[in-house]
Amino acid sequence: MGAAFKARYRRNKETLEWYDALAMAVAIIALVFTFGVRIVKVDGHSMDHTLSDGERILINLLKAPDYGDIVVVDGYTDYGKPLVKRVIAKGGDTISIDYETGTVTVNGEVLQEDYIAEPTYLGYDVEFPYTVPEGTVFVMGDNRNQSLDSRSSYIGCIDEQDILGKVLVCFLPFADFGVVK
């Protein structure tokens, strides 16, 4: 009886250790997803060819936005779905868009935008040159001629506090898995 009891005790101990490890892993994952990262679904075609409609992306909730970062803004408009756009300019910057040549200029420097689908020919109601208010960012979709973004007063500049996070990785569908730049 002593050997059977010891064997059962070892099995129960191993099972409890396994459950403890599983509970710890679940707790860590919950903390990371609560305070560090979040999953968002891309809605629409404004970021084509960088990100496509329906893709799932992982965003970093803790990183402040920088030039060229793709960010997610949640609940900013009555659209009701997260906006996914690229940071073009930050507070204090002056941006100009030449719709004839399709070029974007920030503080007198033409941006090298190898990520855009085509040159920027579509304009909205914001007049250029435009100075971005402090504490905000000017965002645009990579598919410029299919994107409603900071060029429109409907969206306008985004308050930095309204940015949910920076896009890190596209993970679904698996064929598109990779770091987003």
Give the ranges of each region predicted by the language model.
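Residue-level "contact hotspot" at macromolecular interaction interfaces
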Residues: 50, 63-64, 88, 131, ...
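A generic structural signal for residues embedded in beta-strands
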Residues: 59, 73, 97, 139-140, ...
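RNA pseudouridine synthases
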Residues: 85-96
